């Protein structure tokens, strides 16, 4: 039996190259469709694939053709209605149908095409969703790069210490070597054994020939047995190499207001923002830690599940969350070794006497050590004292940004605005 092994890079997806070319060519239309679709999704369905529709006019291929109007002369074969030198009257109006965009009035004539709809995968969706986004002011910590390494497996080697020997790989090599070295002898042995069996059953007996065959069979078996079961050539050892640890370590603090003034719709919008942030971090960076803090009158560090699904609520004192963040930074995240980020979401409702304290904590303790601090206020009401205090911070600190979200449709544009990749001149 003949076996064919398909080693093409695309495997079963033989149109992958064409698909990638299509995505690159119509990236602007696809991203526009994705930005519209994300606002219609539920909080738990943000990271799945998406059906994308593109207007037919946007994907039509360019072609040369006669324009409408003008004066043209053509010669047609005659028939029972027209003879030589007859002229055909020009049709009245432009005629023709168009694409079904849903605009205009009904007509009994004309035809067109619906928008082109296709499905993109989860990976393609997330790549387009977070394209051109990055953590601002991300810097490398050079001393960690020079001093700390981590051991990783790196295949196999023919030399090493006995403790690292790979028994399975060594036995595989031994079997392959013995099979290659004895294959010819085994075929010859099988032929001699078959011949001996045939002669021993024949009449009259051929004693001398049988004796010769038995000697040759014994010699072949001895040669096969002399092939060593294991040889130093077969031995393989697990190989390890030291690689420098990634030099850009980062931690993101997520501070969410869960006080009684935050109704369910406002909390859902805050969660949607943080889910986008979590997907962006996990998709773009390999070694970013996330610290979740929920706060009302009290602040508490929680895990991911409790952050998104806990029903606990209460009054509003924002400064407690900032104090807790400061404590965690001092305890676990040295600013000299970590890039520290924070994203705070609130409806802006805070105890009036507490807002100046928030300004003081941020200005004196947090903003001097963080790379970037973003604040989003989710409300349709007028801004209150917390927003006004934060406006003073924005005017003073370049690493502080704030945005206002009124409706669900504002979440993704605000997210892109906060984490838009900076150019070289901007980062400088």
Swiss-Prot record:
InterPro entries: UPF0229 (IPR006698). Pfam families: DUF444. Residues 78-111 are annotated as: Disordered. Residues 78-90 have a biased composition (Basic and acidic residues). Residues 92-103 have a biased composition (Gly residues). NCBIfam families: PRK05325.1-2, PRK05325.1-3. Belongs to the UPF0229 family. This is UPF0229 protein YeaH. It comes from Salmonella paratyphi A (strain AKU_12601).
